[in-house]
């Protein structure tokens, strides 16, 4: 059985000292770990118009890797201290789409990239009202968002494209196949 000792190095950075058993032949390792906390994501749709809402905003990683700098994404963000997952996704939908969700259902939890980015995101299905304003500017958060509406068949066409996409949005596009609106 492993014994794990955790030493805080700085804010959310830890050194983990791991012993993989009782015998002397077992390995002891030391590994640095960045705890990114938890986040939320939402597949947002409007039942009346039969559309899904996505967002586009500047992403430095896409810029440095010479991809399209404003990738298509689903609504997502971090969970703040003393905030529940449900409160966080409601806040993110309001910040990024400018509306309040009509209904919310948690459908999954995903570890984004084990051993690299240990962040866990809770994925929700969110019915939202018709959106009339398609740009959201939130300078305090560094967000200048363009809202994109897609019909189900348009969203499904993106599944077959071989373009680089973030994991959670790719997951959402695959889940849209099963969603009946």
Give the positions of each predicted feature.
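Short loop segments at secondary-structure junctions
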Residues: 21, 46-49, 58, 127-131, ...
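The catalytic Nudix box helix
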Residues: 74-107, 124, 140-143, 151
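Nudix hydrolase/Nudix homology domain
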Residues: 68-72, 81, 140-181
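Conserved Nudix-box catalytic region and its N-terminal flanking loop in Nudix hydrolases
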Residues: 34-36, 43, 51-91, 141
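Active-site-adjacent beta-strand/loop module that shapes the phosphate/pyrophosphate-binding cleft
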Residues: 14-24, 113-133
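Conserved hydrophobic/aromatic beta-strand scaffold that supports enzyme active sites
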Residues: 13-15, 43, 54, 123-125, ...
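Acidic, metal-coordinating catalytic segment for phosphate/diphosphate chemistry
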Residues: 5-48, 63
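Structural motif
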Residues: 52, 69, 118-123, 145
